[in-house]
Each structure stands twice: as C-alpha cells, then as structure tokens.
C-alpha cells in the first residue's frame, strides 16, 4: 500500500465516530431543498435522500426488470449507502474501504440489520480494486475521490469494474473552475484549500478535471450538477451540533477518537465557508459505460 494510502487508512480508522451522534451509519452530507432549514429530527432522512437523489439523477430505472443486478460503493464508509440501497431497491451491494476499522463496523451493521446475504464489505484500495473487469452494474462513490491524489487511476478503476451499460456515479467536493483569463487559483484560495486538505487528507481539483479524465474512457451520457446549495443546510446543522456543548462533551468522552473528532471538525468550518464563498462546490457526476 502506498504511503499516502496508509495515512488515509489511519485517518479513517481514527475518525470513526466523528458524526455518529447525528448521522449514524452515513458519513456524508444530507440533501435538502435550497434554503431549507435542517433539523436533527429530519437529518437522517436527508442523508438517505442524497443517495436516492443521486440515483434519480443517474436515471435509476423504475422498472424492477431493468434494475441493476448489483452495486459497488467505492469508499463505502461504515456501509450506510449499501445498507440503504440493498433494503430499498433489493439488489446485491458490495462496499470497499481502505479502513479496516470502518469495514468491521459496516459488517456489524449489516449483521444487525439481517442483510449479510445481500451486503458485503471488503478492505481494499480504490486505486487497485480486487474485482474483475465488468463486475458491477452500478458503481457509486460519495466523498472518496477528493481524498486521493491519483484521480485518473481512481476513475479508470471505477470504469474498469463497471459492466457494459453500467451506471457510474461520483459525488465529490471540487474547487471552482478557472475563468478563461486565469492560470491558477488566487494565492489566498490555494492557502485555504491546502489548510483544509492537510487536515482531512484531501486534494481538490475542478470538476472539469473529472470530465477530462473520463473523455478517453469508454463512457457516454456524462451529466453533471452542482448540489452545493442542497447540502448547505446539512453542513450548517453538522457544525452546529459539533460545536455545541453536548457535541464537544460527547466527543471528549470517546478518548482518542474524540480528540480526533474535534480536530477533524475544525477544518469543517473552513470547508463550509469555502462552500459559501464559491471556492468549493459539491457536485454530482454520472455517466454510462459504453456497450
């Protein structure tokens, strides 16, 4: 395993539990109508809505006869997406994660929900996945590609394991695209991204890079959308809870994991501001592997 991948695995191992008081088995933002107010009581519904909205955007078939045979979640966290998709859509789901600790938790959640026959999880590297070519009808990734420096290899691997005609979905933070007159981001913008990235093991690029990386690959029907305003209420709520007295005390009671949680929350304030300022965006990209 490459050195930066080992660091990423350690980061995720230690980061388990950062959002579990609010997000439970999901390690991503929720989806809301722009301008909505997020509430703790309704937050879990917004988390699964993000998954459903992504599938809808990718034109997930309503006809049960045309639904995918199986799904791969690349960078699956503690398994929430696989568990939701397996239950709601009744398809086989597999998750891969570089963090042994998170895979262990995901396996426990699957067992607790009686889904061992429909859901499984592997410890593995997203840049070198242990699956044959064309193994999956749906390949999805949420909040993973921004944590990897070699984005070209990541995208190639997603396309490689996708079957002919399979749907590929990527949800990710990116930085703003450059204007025609710009050669690079402003120095202050680069400093902000470095500060966020160094804290949460992330390397940001513009959305146009993803499209360019897909261009030479056997894919078609590329669709993109900016969902920054849709996750804004979720981001606000997560920060509010994390910085509340209850949130801080709850994390401190977790010992080492709690200190890690607090350290990981601090750059979230920078990320939220970068989203508000338009420096960072949250996007969805889908495409279909050519037949």
From Swiss-Prot:
Mainly expressed in roots, but barely detectable in stems and flowers. It holds the Pfam family Methyltransf_11. Optimum pH is 7.5. GO terms for molecular function: S-adenosylmethionine-dependent methyltransferase activity. One of its GO terms (cellular component) is cytoplasm. Residues 71-80 are annotated as: SAM motif I. Pathway: Alkaloid biosynthesis; ajmaline biosynthesis. It comes from the Eukaryota. Residues 161-170 are annotated as: SAM motif III. Signal peptide: none annotated. The keyword Signal does not apply. Its EC number is 2.1.1.393. N-methyltransferase involved in the biosynthesis of ajmaline-type monoterpenoid indole alkaloids (MIAs) natural products, important plant-derived pharmaceuticals used in the therapy of heart disorders. Catalyzes the indole N-methylation of ajmaline to produce 4-methylajmaline. Also able, with a lower efficiency, to mediates the conversion of norajmaline to 4-methylnorajmaline. Homodimer. This is Ajmaline N-methyltransferase. It comes from Rauvolfia serpentina. The gene is ANMT.
């Amino acid at each position: 395993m490459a050195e930066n991948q080992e660091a990423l695995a350690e980061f995720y191992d230690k980061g388990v539990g950062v959002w579990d008081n609010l997000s439970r088995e999901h390690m991503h933002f929720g989806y809301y109508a722009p301008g909505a107010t997020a509430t703790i009581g309704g937050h879990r519904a917004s988390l699964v809505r993000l998954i459903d909205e992504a599938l809808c955007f990718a034109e997930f078939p309503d006809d049960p006869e045309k639904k995918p045979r199986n799904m791969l979640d690349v960078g699956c966290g503690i398994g929430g997406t696989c568990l939701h998709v397996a239950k709601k859509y009744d398809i086989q789901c597999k998750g891969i994660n570089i963090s042994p600790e998170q895979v262990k938790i995901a396996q426990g959640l699957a067992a607790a929900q009686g889904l061992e026959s429909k859901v499984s999880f592997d410890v593995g590297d997203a840049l070198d996945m242990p699956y044959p070519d064309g193994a999956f009808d749906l390949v999805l990734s949420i909040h993973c590609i921004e944590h990897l420096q070699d984005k070209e290899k990541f995208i190639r691997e997603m396309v490689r394991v996708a079957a002919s005609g399979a749907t590929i979905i990527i949800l990710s933070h990116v930085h703003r695209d450059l204007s025609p007159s710009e050669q690079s981001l402003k120095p202050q913008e680069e400093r902000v991204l470095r500060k966020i990235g160094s804290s949460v093991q992330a390397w940001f690029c513009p959305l146009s890079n993803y499209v360019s990386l897909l261009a030479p690959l056997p894919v078609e029907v590329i669709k993109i959308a900016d969902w920054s305003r849709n996750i804004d209420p979720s981001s606000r709520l997560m920060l509010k809870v994390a910085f509340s007295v209850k949130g801080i005390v709850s994390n401190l009671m977790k010992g080492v994991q709690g200190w890690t949680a607090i350290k990981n929350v601090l750059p979230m304030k920078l990320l939220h501001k970068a989203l508000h300022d338009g420096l960072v965006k949250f996007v969805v990209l889908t495409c279909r592997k050519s037949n």
